[in-house]
């Protein structure tokens, strides 16, 4: 943020096939920030304080979910910015893109049973110290919708062990694993805890009228209350 009185500007990337960019913008606005549309074919990140990669089926999920989006000019610009500390949240397809781009370890594959899953899902917050989860308590259980066909998180045994040992499993499925993810993992973060990827959709849990509650809203307010101050000038 460049001025103390200005709201934080959170960029939301739109790919061909994105579905949830507008819902994400509404969630960002509900959190008190200004959503900024970022087109996949552009590479300008000037003036944004954080970036969200929303859910959907980028480029039709051809080859693999997120496999083509990783080569877009916007993701190419995000990689060095992310490594420099820009907070990034990848939701569902956005999580897949982050893994394909090498910003998070592991991969998201077909759900066990090969069925698309759409339901309200209980989660347990296990890493409340990330840029996007500072508003939650350690061990807090929340309810956020899931909707995906390729949400099964997989990684090599040593990667899984490192994630667990370093406390980088951000949220874990509770009350039934919807997709067969290793160790019930629903979301993870990078080593510096500025990048979070998760399969559940917090943007669909920011209003009692349209979602299962407002448990998702704090994922957007968290980045405003804490980490963005480190990027203010």
Curated annotation (Swiss-Prot):
Pathway: Purine metabolism; IMP biosynthesis via de novo pathway; 5-amino-1-(5-phospho-D-ribosyl)imidazole from N(2)-formyl-N(1)-(5-phospho-D-ribosyl)glycinamide: step 1/2. Residues 9-233 form the Glutamine amidotransferase type-1 domain. Keywords: ATP-binding, Cytoplasm, Glutamine amidotransferase, Hydrolase, Ligase, Nucleotide-binding, Purine biosynthesis. InterPro entries: Class_I_gatase-like, PRibForGlyAmidine_synth_PurQ. Its main location: cytoplasm. GO terms for molecular function: ATP binding; glutaminase activity; phosphoribosylformylglycinamidine synthase activity. It comes from the Bacteria. The keyword Lipoprotein does not apply. It catalyses: N(2)-formyl-N(1)-(5-phospho-beta-D-ribosyl)glycinamide + L-glutamine + ATP + H2O = 2-formamido-N(1)-(5-O-phospho-beta-D-ribosyl)acetamidine + L-glutamate + ADP + phosphate + H(+); L-glutamine + H2O = L-glutamate + NH4(+). The active site is at 92 (nucleophile), 201, 203. Part of the phosphoribosylformylglycinamidine synthase complex involved in the purines biosynthetic pathway. Catalyzes the ATP-dependent conversion of formylglycinamide ribonucleotide (FGAR) and glutamine to yield formylglycinamidine ribonucleotide (FGAM) and glutamate. The FGAM synthase complex is composed of three subunits. PurQ produces an ammonia molecule by converting glutamine to glutamate. PurL transfers the ammonia molecule to FGAR to form FGAM in an ATP-dependent manner. This is Phosphoribosylformylglycinamidine synthase subunit PurQ. It comes from Frankia casuarinae (strain DSM 45818 / CECT 9043 / HFP020203 / CcI3).
